[in-house]
C-alpha cells in the first residue's frame, strides 16, 4: 500500500509535522539519513499510520503518485544534497515541498532547476516552532500554483486555525515568494522582541519596577490593543522563579542569539532600497548584545547619566505602552512596504492583507492588530504604507507625543532604546515633505560630479562649485 505523503528529515520539526499530518487522517512515509532517528520515531508512534523507510529508493517507492514529499532538512547544502538524491527517483509532476528555514533566493534557484526536470517545487515558510509544527503552524507556501492546489487540502488540514475557523495558510505566490514572506515575518519578529525588551529596560532601569510588577504590567497590556503571543509569554517569563526563588530572567546572560533571518531581511531591504530601520536596529541590537566582554570593559571606563525618574510612574508607564504600540505599527509598516516592493520587483502579486490573516494564529508574531492590517488592505489594496490607513494614522498621530517623551527620557537617562528611537525617526522622516538630502546631493556633485535635479525647473544639472 502506498502512502499519501512523505517526510524527509526527522529532527523535531519534521517529526512533529509528520505526526500533525497523520493526526489529520493522512498516511505518512518517513525517512531520515540516520536510521536511529527513524527507529526512534517508530517507537514513539504506536498505532499511528507512520511508515518507516530506510533508503531514498524505498521511501520514493512507498508514495502514491504524483508524489508529495515534504523536506525538513537543514537549510543550505543539506537541502541541495537531499534534492540531488531524490531527483533521479522522481517522475514528472511529483511535488517537493521545502519546509526549512531557507533563503528565498535558494528557493528561486531550486524552483527553476527542478521545473526544467518537470518536478514541482514549493518553498514553504513554517512558523510556530516545534509546538506549532505539532498542533498547527502558520504556513507560507510559494511555487507552482497547480502544485499547491494538489497539496492544499493537506496544508489546510495541518495549519493553525484562527478564531473564525480559517486555516492560517494561503498560496503566497510563485517561486521564492513563500520563503521570502517567512523571512520578512522573522524580521518583524526581531523588531517585536526588541521593542518589548526596550519596554522592559525602561520599567526596570528607569522606573525601578520589580519582576512581579513587570509581569503584571505585560499581562494587563495583553488584555488590550497590544494583545499578542509575545506580550503574553513575556508576562509568563517574569513570573518564573529559579531555584533560589528569584526571577529567572534576571539570571539569563544578556547575549541574544540569532539564526540569520533577521540579517537576511535587512540585507534584502538594502538591496531593494527600502527603509527598514526598526528591524535593522533590532538586528544590530543583538550584535551589540553579543560583545558582552567588550561591554563589561566599556562600562568601567565610559561614563554616562545614571537612570533617575521623578515623575508619576503610572502615567509614564502608559506612555511606554503607547510608545510600544506606535513603534510596532511603524515596524509593520516598514515590513509590509518591503514586501510590497519585492512583490513588484519579482512580479509575485502578493496579497498583503491575506498575509496578515495567516499570521493570526500558529506563528510567533500572532497578534490582535493583524486584523487591522487586513482591514487596511481591504479598504485600499494599493495602500502605499500602513501609516496612511485611517486607523493607523489616527493611532500614530495620537501616540507620537508618548513615543517622543519615552525616547527623550531614555536618552537623557542613558537607557538604550534603538528600536523606539528608530521608530520616531522613521515617522518624522516619512512625514517630512523636505529632508536635508539636497545638501547630500550637492556634496556628491561637488566631489564627484554626480549631478542633481532642481525643484524649480526640469533637467539634470552639474555645478562648478568653486571658481578656479
From Swiss-Prot:
One biological process term in Gene Ontology: pentose-phosphate shunt
SUPFAM superfamilies according to UniProt: 6-phosphogluconate dehydrogenase C-terminal domain-like (SSF48179), NAD(P)-binding Rossmann-fold domains (SSF51735)
Recorded metabolic or biological pathway in which this protein acts: Carbohydrate degradation; pentose phosphate pathway; D-ribulose 5-phosphate from D-glucose 6-phosphate (oxidative stage): step 3/3
Keywords noted in UniProt: Gluconate utilization, NADP, Oxidoreductase, Pentose shunt
Active site per UniProt: 182, 189
Domain of life, per lineage: Bacteria
Pfam families: 6PGD, NAD_binding_2
Quaternary structure and partners: Homodimer.
InterPro entries from the UniProt entry: 6-PGluconate_DH-like_C_sf, 6PGD_dom2, 6PGDH_C, 6PGDH_Gnd/GntZ, 6PGDH_NADP-bd, 6PGdom_BS, NAD(P)-bd_dom_sf, Pgluconate_DH
MF terms (GO), sorted A to Z: NADP binding; phosphogluconate dehydrogenase (decarboxylating) activity
Reactions that this protein is recorded to catalyse: 6-phospho-D-gluconate + NADP(+) = D-ribulose 5-phosphate + CO2 + NADPH
PROSITE patterns per UniProt: 6PGD
Family: Belongs to the 6-phosphogluconate dehydrogenase family.
PANTHER family in UniProt: 6-PHOSPHOGLUCONATE DEHYDROGENASE (PTHR11811)
E.C. number(s) listed in UniProt: 1.1.1.44
Keyword Transmembrane helix: no
Binding site for NADP(+): 9-14, 32-34, 73-75, 101
Signal peptide extent: none
Name the UniProt record assigns to this protein: 6-phosphogluconate dehydrogenase, decarboxylating
NCBIfam families: gnd (TIGR00873), PRK09287.1 (NF006765)
Binding-site positions, substrate: 101, 127-129, 185-186, 190, 259, 286, 444, 450
Role noted for this protein: Catalyzes the oxidative decarboxylation of 6-phosphogluconate to ribulose 5-phosphate and CO(2), with concomitant reduction of NADP to NADPH.
Amino acid at each position: 500500500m502506498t502512502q499519501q505523503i512523505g517526510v524527509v528529515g526527522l529532527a523535531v520539526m519534521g517529526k512533529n509535522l509528520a505526526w500533525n499530518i497523520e493526526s489529520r487522517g493522512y498516511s505518512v512515509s518517513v525517512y531520515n539519513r540516520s536510521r536511529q532517528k527513524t527507529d526512534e520515531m517508530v517507537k514513539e508512534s504506536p498505532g499511528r499510520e507512520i511508515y518507516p523507510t530506510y533508503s531514498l529508493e524505498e521511501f520514493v517507492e512507498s508514495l502514491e503518485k504524483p508524489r508529495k514529499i515534504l523536506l525538513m532538512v537543514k537549510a543550505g547544502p543539506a537541502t541541495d544534497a537531499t534534492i540531488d538524491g531524490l531527483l533521479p527517483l522522481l517522475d514528472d509532476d511529483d511535488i517537493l515541498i521545502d519546509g526549512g528555514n531557507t533563503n528565498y533566493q535558494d528557493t528561486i534557484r531550486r524552483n527553476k532547476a527542478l521545473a526544467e526536470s518537470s518536478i514541482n517545487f514549493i518553498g514553504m515558510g513554517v512558523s510556530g516552532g516545534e509546538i506549532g509544527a505539532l498542533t498547527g503552524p502558520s504556513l507560507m507556501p510559494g511555487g507552482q500554483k497547480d502544485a499547491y492546489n494538489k497539496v492544499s487540502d493537506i496544508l489546510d488540514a495541518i495549519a493553525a486555525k484562527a478564531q473564525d475557523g480559517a486555516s492560517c495558510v494561503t498560496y503566497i505566490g510563485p517561486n521564492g515568494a513563500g520563503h521570502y514572506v517567512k523571512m520578512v515575518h522573522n524580521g518583524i519578529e526581531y523588531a517585536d522582541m526588541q521593542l518589548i525588551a526596550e519596554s522592559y529596560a525602561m520599567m526596570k532601569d528607569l522606573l525601578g519596577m520589580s519582576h512581579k510588577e513587570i509581569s503584571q504590567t505585560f499581562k494587563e497590556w495583553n488584555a488590550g490593543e497590544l494583545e499578542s503571543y509575545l506580550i503574553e509569554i513575556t508576562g509568563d517569563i517574569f513570573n518564573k522563579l529559579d531555584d533560589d526563588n528569584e526571577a529567572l530572567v534576571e539570571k539569563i546572560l544578556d547575549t541574544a542569539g540569532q539564526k540569520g533571518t533577521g540579517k537576511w531581511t535587512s540585507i534584502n531591504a538594502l538591496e531593494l532600497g527600502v527603509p527598514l530601520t526598526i528591524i535593522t536596529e533590532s538586528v544590530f541590537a543583538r550584535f551589540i548584545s553579543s560583545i558582552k566582554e567588550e561591554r563589561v570593559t566599556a562600562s568601567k571606563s565610559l561614563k554616562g547619566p545614571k537612570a533617575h525618574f521623578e515623575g508619576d510612574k503610572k502615567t509614564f508607564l502608559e506612555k511606554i505602552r503607547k510608545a510600544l504600540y506606535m513603534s510596532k505599527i511603524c515596524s509593520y509598516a516598514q515590513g509590509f512596504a518591503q514586501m510590497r516592493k519585492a512583490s513588484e520587483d519579482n512580479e509575485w502579486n502578493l496579497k498583503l492583507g491575506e498575509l496578515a490573516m495567516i499570521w493570526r494564529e500558529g506563528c510567533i508574531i500572532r497578534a490582535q492588530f493583524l486584523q487591522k492590517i487586513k482591514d487596511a488592505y481591504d479598504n485600499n489594496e494599493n495602500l502605499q504604507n500602513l501609516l496612511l490607513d485611517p486607523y493607523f494614522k489616527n493611532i500614530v498621530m495620537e501616540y507620537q507625543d508618548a513615543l517622543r517623551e519615552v525616547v527623550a527620557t531614555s536618552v537623557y537617562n542613558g537607557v538604550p532604546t534603538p528600536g523606539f528611537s528608530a521608530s520616531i525617526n522613521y515617522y518624522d522622516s516619512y512625514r517630512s515633505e523636505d529632508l536635508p538630502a539636497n545638501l547630500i546631493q550637492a556634496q556628491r556633485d561637488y566631489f564627484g560630479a554626480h549631478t542633481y535635479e532642481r525643484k524649480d525647473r526640469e533637467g539634470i544639472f552639474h555645478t562648478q562649485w568653486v571658481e578656479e
